[in-house]
Amino acid sequence: MAQEEPGGSNSVLNGDANSDKKMEKWTCALCPEGHDWSVIYFEPSSNIAAHENCLLYSSGLVECGPHDPRNPARSFAVKSVKKEIWRGRRLKCSFCNNKGATVGCDLQSCPKNYHLHCAKEDRAILQVDEDYGTYKLFCQRHAPGGQEPTQVDAAVKASFLKKCLEAGLLTELFEQIQQKMISIHGRFMDDTASESDYEGIKILLFDCGLFKDTLIKFEEAIKSKACECEERLNQMKQQLELLADLQQNLRSFQECGVLDPSGSTSGSLLPPEDHQCRCQESPEVQAGSGDSL
């Protein structure tokens, strides 16, 4: 469905003078040839630049001409790209929680949206049919049957870890994993964790089996916490009963006239004999005290 063209003064989104123009294909002079991010489409007069793959995988954007497998250049209308930018400004990324997430899971009922690089971080599946020019993305949960998030087999993964050990880099790898876990823990604590954070921890704890013994030990922590809460609850009940008893005692004192509401409590707090002793100090003692100053 076509998106409403926004108003305002933003040079990227306003004006229809260039609505029939197409984006120009540029290649980054510093990126390796064939790199995912090396191809950029640019339209100078509208001040728009976008990675080719970000355009290809954006859910609300299609090329403005028929796909030609023999022609590597793509055809993106500036007007369509502006609409997609505006659409993305209203969509939050399921991975980083920032707006501008135009890449959605291809399953229509799935609410997940991503920036393309965030989708890769979240181990989403990219599907390309170059003959028909279709580019699809699926989140981990809705990946097509039989297709794993990574196509590297287990033997290669194990070999990678052994090579890290031999190269003296295994400690650094685990330190980075630890930093990642600390970062996720921080987002959980300040209530900014994304859905992908919850999904990742769920997979880590329940699907891989690596932390099975951790969950068994965690059961003891749950029991200990429950006992601690129950003990605090009993203490609070005892305190409430004590406070209620004190309140009842005060009411009884008032009814018996022990507490006189009209009595003054502004007098000296010293015992009567001590107060009298201070009042009867001789003038010589008082004078001596004055001389010492």
Swiss-Prot record:
One of its GO terms (cellular component) is nucleus. A zinc finger (PHD-type) spans 91-143. A zinc finger (C2HC pre-PHD-type) spans 25-61. The keyword Nucleus applies. One of its GO terms (molecular function) is zinc ion binding. InterPro entries: EPHD, PHD-type_Zinc_Finger, Znf_FYVE_PHD, Znf_PHD, Znf_RING/FYVE/PHD. PROSITE patterns: EPHD. Residues 263-293 are annotated as: Disordered. It comes from the Eukaryota. It is found in: Nucleus. The keyword Translocase does not apply. Keywords: Metal-binding, Nucleus, Zinc, Zinc-finger. SMART domains: PHD. Gene3D superfamilies: Zinc/RING finger domain, C3HC4 (zinc finger) (3.30.40.10). Pfam families: zf-HC5HC2H (PF13771). Its main location: nucleus. PANTHER family: PHD FINGER PROTEIN (PTHR12420), PHD FINGER PROTEIN 11 (PTHR12420:SF4). This is PHD finger protein 11-like. It comes from Rattus norvegicus (Rat). The lineage of its organism: Eukaryota, Metazoa, Chordata, Craniata, Vertebrata. The gene is Phf11l.
